[in-house]
């Protein structure tokens, strides 16, 4: 469970948007980078979006989850936590670094690959 995502969901419930930043420093140039963002849309808060470094990775719309993109183990962790917190269902996601392959599995069958 990714505590950062849980905290962002709680904040987004109150504010509509919640962001978490990371701080990267290379060659003496500090840079403030948005790591995660959770956005709530709709009058009843029906549509939720999860962004990781500016890329849309998952959406929950009216209780139906959609995995949009993934390419790392941190994407697997954040997407699983995001969907589990909002729907109560934990999706089966896998990242294989040796193959550079991200898969979404439902009912034992691969439904998406990135």
Residue ranges and their predicted role:
Residues 1-114:
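Terminal leader/tail segments of proteins
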């Amino acid at each position: 469970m990714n505590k950062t995502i849980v905290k962002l969901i709680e904040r987004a419930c109150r504010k509509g948007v919640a962001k978490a930043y990371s701080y990267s420093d290379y060659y003496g140039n500090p840079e403030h980078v948005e790591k995660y963002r959770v956005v709530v849309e709709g009058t009843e808060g029906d549509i939720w979006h999860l962004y990781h470094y500016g890329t849309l990775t998952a959406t929950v719309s009216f209780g139906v989850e959609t995995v949009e993109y993934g390419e790392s183990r941190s994407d697997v962790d954040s997407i699983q936590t995001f969907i589990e917190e909002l729907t109560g269902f934990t999706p089966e996601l896998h990242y294989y670094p040796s193959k550079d392959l991200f898969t979404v599995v439902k009912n034992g069958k691969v439904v998406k690959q990135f």
